[in-house]
Swiss-Prot record:
It catalyses: tRNA(Ile) + L-isoleucine + ATP = L-isoleucyl-tRNA(Ile) + AMP + diphosphate. Catalyzes the attachment of isoleucine to tRNA(Ile). As IleRS can inadvertently accommodate and process structurally similar amino acids such as valine, to avoid such errors it has two additional distinct tRNA(Ile)-dependent editing activities. One activity is designated as 'pretransfer' editing and involves the hydrolysis of activated Val-AMP. The other activity is designated 'posttransfer' editing and involves deacylation of mischarged Val-tRNA(Ile). It comes from Methanocella arvoryzae (strain DSM 22066 / NBRC 105507 / MRE50). It comes from the Archaea. Coiled coil: none annotated. Gene3D superfamilies: 3.30.720.200, HUPs (3.40.50.620), Isoleucyl-tRNA Synthetase, Domain 1 (1.10.730.10). A motif ('KMSKS' region) lies at residues 644-648. Belongs to the class-I aminoacyl-tRNA synthetase family. IleS type 2 subfamily. IleRS has two distinct active sites: one for aminoacylation and one for editing. The misactivated valine is translocated from the active site to the editing site, which sterically excludes the correctly activated isoleucine. The single editing site contains two valyl binding pockets, one specific for each substrate (Val-AMP or Val-tRNA(Ile)). InterPro entries: aa-tRNA-synth_I_CS, aa-tRNA-synth_Ia, Anticodon_Ile_ABEc, Ile-tRNA-ligase, Ile-tRNA-ligase_type2, M/V/L/I-tRNA-synth_anticd-bd, Rossmann-like_a/b/a_fold, tRNAsynth_Ia_anticodon-bd. This is Isoleucine--tRNA ligase. The lineage of its organism: Archaea, Methanobacteriati, Methanobacteriota, Stenosarchaea group, Methanomicrobia.
Amino acid sequence: MIQEEKEQYSSKSLEAGVDELWRASDAYALTRKKRLGSKRFFFVDGPPYTTGRIHLGTAWNKIIKDSVLRYRSMNGYDLIDRPGWDMHGLPIEVKVESILGFKTKKDIEEFGVARFTEECKKFAIGNMHEMTSQFKKLGVWMNWDDPYMTLKNEYIEAAWWTIKQAHEKHLLERGLRNVNWCPRCETAIADSEVEYADRKDDSIYVKFPLKNEEGFLVIWTTTPWTIPANMAVAANKDFTYAMVYALPAAVLEEAAMQAGLDHTTLVEHHSDGRPKPMRYSDKVAKMKEAIGEEKVKELYEKHGEKLIIARDLVDGVLKMGRYADYQVLKTMTGEELKGTEYVHPLADLIPCQKETEHKVYLADFVVGENTGMVHIAPGHGFDDFELGLKEGIRAYCPVKANGHYDDSVGAYAGMEIREANPKIMEDLRQRNLLLGATTIEHRYGHCWRCKTPIIFLTTDQWFIAVSKMKEDMLAEVKRVNWYPDWAGSARFYDWVNGARDWCVSRQRYWGIPIPIWKCEKCGSLDVIGTKEELERKVGREVPDLHRPFVDEVRLECECGGSMRRVEDIFDVWFDSAVASWATLHFPGRKDLMDWWPADFIVEGHDQTRGWFYSQLGAGMVGFGKAPYNGVCMHGFTLDETGKKMSKSLGNVVAPEDVVEKLGADTLRLYVLSQNAPWEDLSFSWEECGNINRAINIFWNVYRFPLPYMVLDKFDPAKVTLESVKGSLRVEDRWILSKLQAVIKDVDTYMATYELHRATRSIISFILEDLSRWYVQLARERTWVEADDPDKLAAYRVLYDTLVTTVKLIAPFTPYIAERMYQNLVRNVSAEAPVSVHMCDWPVVDSSLLDEQLNRDMDIARKIVEASSNARQKAKRKLRWPVQKIVVAAENPDVVTAVKDLSGVIGEQTNSKEVVVLAPGEANTELGVEVVPNPKLIGPIFKAVAGKVTAALKEADGRAVKKAIEEEKKYIVEIPEGSFDILLDMVSFRDVIPESLAMADFPGGKVYVDVTLSKELEAEGYTRELIRRIQDMRKEMNLNVEDRIKVEVYVGDEKVLDLVKSMKDYAAGEVRADTLDLKTEKPAAGFVKDWDVEGIPMTIGLEKI
């Protein structure tokens, strides 16, 4: 049978108990077993890196997934819900390097690759176990006994199979490409792995000497270290360029001083004598005047420099270079500038640059900024490399994997590139080729794992030719269902549209080895697709497919030569890219692929360029389609002010701290309901606390009827809804109808992954409909001692409402739902499903859904709220009854609602009578005040206007209004004569008497009669007395069924007499066998003094 819940809500003990229940009953396995063979729902988990403890964003991610999976399971779906773990790549390597104190790849080589990869494996597996425990404490149900792990051989085979497909479909290419490169990790990294942050860098303007004439091309760069690799200059064919003859400011200033120019003449003054800045152009004019035209000409011939700059940018560049004056010698188009030859500015220091031909090419990527020309180093830039391919420019890349120059750069050989910047700038300055230098702060790419600034290198890499599949990929993006739609139609579509060929090779150790063997003799390739294929070809078992073990495998080539595996491993994003078929154990098993593609994936919005993209690319390679049908994108978790959480800011909120303080259910319901999944979530302890209070209210609503049900031995198996149908009150029908509407809403929202709306709908139902309305209406019915049909109807409705609500909230707050279910259902029937999560999802019962009643009750509640507001104005507590309320309706819907629900409204407003006035019907209890219109009365009545106005104000407003409505006029009688008052000469204002209090609501006004009769006063004091006795019962920890005897001293004879008239009513309400009203204070039992509305009372209670 149902048990009473005596304890207050405690998340810690409740959740621990439910965890133990699930473990002991094997609830997860039984739940999944129940749905085997049903309609299918294939979910693929985006695998987190096993690099440490989970954070709030990871927790939110898994909570969303778990809630959707629980909902789908209750809706009858057979699920695939394997959790995934990303256990390879730089995320793991960098952590292990830090633990071991390594700084470079050389440290790893000296330590030993086998030992290093073993350390990585242990680190990844250890963290996986820790993170699994954390996820379980969030109530996440997944197939934790069989996760997919990217380090397992069967998973590695899924990646090998995919790359073999790429090879067979001519989508796998190797060649020189310009890639993002991390010099610390010494590997290529993908565009999606580049993290941008503000950084200060050198900003320099450099003069490149023309080869065949006097003058310079001027370029700008923020990477001085790329100057040694310069192979060309790019201009824009649509720009106009100018060759200017520029005179350095220092030369002109020195000549002016030698000419005897008094510097005081270079200062202007305000009218009051104060100095003011002189424009530099005016200073230049004065200096030239002082020097003389011939001398200026001589200065130009001796010191002038001929510079080629985009015409519109000349002034800015010359200001940067501190040139005082210039003349435009000629202009040219970009097309005319094409082919212009120049000499490398550091050719004397870099031997190979002496022998290289350098000239100007045209490129559309050159923009009208800085100088209008771009220095081209095909070895160190994507656009540069592409221009080099087009024009046949050599991709000279003198930088090694560790970010140091090689020996080909002469004077800079062996230097770290950024440490070489000052020397390069100084060498340019000594050659008078550094036009200007400063520093700028700009967004610059960094390695996603070690945070080192990236560089661009041209290296030999393995690529998947995304460019060959792009149109098909974009078509698939359109086919997939995106939640929200713009995540796919805008953000992801744009990313795919701009994507380059995918560099899938990495020069590291801990990852999936690229399964390509190359013949050392003839150079032919063999791409291996499975472990079995490799073992068949090598003739022995290969137990571990990682480095260095797989590196030791040699294959025999058809030419007789020996084939060695290429050293590279896969980009770690390629690991997770194959997750949707690796989850299904493919290619080892083919029978599960009819589940594919995934019905649902959900990850953060950063995955538009991460996992969403890599999966799409791999899916197109393997199967020619996207590996998912539905994608939901969620936001990031931020602090309360909207800032990113970071340890350095001290604003990190750990999920385990929230669980410890408020419970897993609170954290779950908070992150699900706070905002739409695709919006960023700014975590607030206060808002999270509000959700905890909502859960507490739900717990108390659940606890409320239990003592009465236990006392009355209520048996839901015997007291069915059908058996009490004839005793249902309108509020019973309403709460059941409202519940159907909530089921309908939740289903609608869950279909589009609007979990915030689904959870808010349930929370609102619990707080507003169930707790603050229905329970208040039903409370007194549960106190009836007799075996009353009305009470049983309330029990049954409460029971059904609670059980259904428990099922509705179960996917979102699984712990409290389970605890309530076990008491309300399992304690009633041992045949019921072991867990609430095994139950079928509630289905809308159309016979219970009454939309009109729902609308009427919404109106009734607004009327009750308005009545409460009016009472507050009159300082009349709700506990004190009023004779009546009058509802002045503004539309017919309000009239209908009041008539149909007058009993509910009367009970909730504590009024003896509820009166409704139809739209336009006058409230005769209101006074009517005449408001004369002076704009009409003055001009019409002129000299007597004041007396007419005074007469109107003194007249009976109701009579004036009636006369105008019926006779179209009202006649004012004054000594000067009779005057007709027409409708537009006056308006009317209601006058609320002191006996009424008024408040508005959407749909009309509510007037509360606050007149206090003797009978109402007696009831008011009696209700005050009852409340205090009930409080004392609670303090004595009495059970509902405990009987008491009461003695009451009332320190006012009048009030004593009033309470005596309702003594029997009070005794019944507090379950007192005797209630004696005395003139002396009680001494026996639990005695307490009270102040009741200014009247001293002393109450004594004794349990019988």
